[in-house]
């Protein structure tokens, strides 16, 4: 059911009226590992994209959106508007990504 929750970065959903339920979020934190760190160290010398980190951040974004949808579903929402991402490092070797927005319920 959570995968059916509409998530949009816009404030309005064209053609839909809704009531605001409240703030909703999904968060994940992942740690780097020795193999990623070794590869990143080599890439920092020669330059270029660090694909292992890009993959980790993409996975983190996907997980945070899935958790946002689950949270919204548990609140009885049909959609999330004004979705945004925020991210940051924790203790230098962990990356946290949060997806947040406003849970809404459609009015017929």
From Swiss-Prot:
SUPFAM superfamilies: YbjQ-like. This is UPF0145 protein LJ_1287. Gene3D superfamilies: Hypothetical protein apc22750. Chain B (3.30.110.70). It holds the Pfam family YbjQ_1. It comes from the Bacteria. It comes from Lactobacillus johnsonii (strain CNCM I-12250 / La1 / NCC 533). Transmembrane segments: none annotated. Belongs to the UPF0145 family.
């Amino acid at each position: 059911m959570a995968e059916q929750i509409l998530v949009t970065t816009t404030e309005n959903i064209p053609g839909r009226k809704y009531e605001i339920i409240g703030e909703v979020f999904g968060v994940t934190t992942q740690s780097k590992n020795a193999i990623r760190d070794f590869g990143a160290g080599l890439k920092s010398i020669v330059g270029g994209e660090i694909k292992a980190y890009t993959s980790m951040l993409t996975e983190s974004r996907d997980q945070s959106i899935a958790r946002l949808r689950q949270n919204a579903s548990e609140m009885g929402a049909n959609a999330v508007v004004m979705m945004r991402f925020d991210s940051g490092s924790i203790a230098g070797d962990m990356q946290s990504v949060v997806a947040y927005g406003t849970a809404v319920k459609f009015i017929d």
